[in-house]
Amino acid sequence: MTQDKYAYIYNKVKDALETDKLFLRPELSLSLLSRVVGTNTVYLSKAINNGFGCSYSQLINCYRINYLIEEAQRTGENIALLAARCRFWSRSTFFDVFRQHTGMTPHRYMENVRRSSFPKHMHDHEGQRIIIEKG
């Protein structure tokens, strides 16, 4: 597959996630996203790996955590309710994913946000800033 095709798929994925907020749909899967984008799952997976620098599940979780944090800051809504709306059905999975992306528990993160002008960017489990988009 050509670089132009990968770039096209990358842009379609980005649009589906950012504009259509597909990551909030309960039935979202790699297969569904491939149909929305208009490609097969192999090309989609490769385009995600190359364009976003992560796997499909890491990408979806990153969008979900970013959305959850933005909504919690904007509305003050309970973070556990937001986690369910963001399709984190297991509390332990949510806590693990949240900690991987922020470096702390949801409660501690929100306390820091409320107390100060705590940076609102995300980190992966090694303390590196998460890059949603290369380039």
List the predicted regions and their residue ranges.
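The alpha-helix within a helix-turn-helix
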Residues: S34, S45, A83-A84
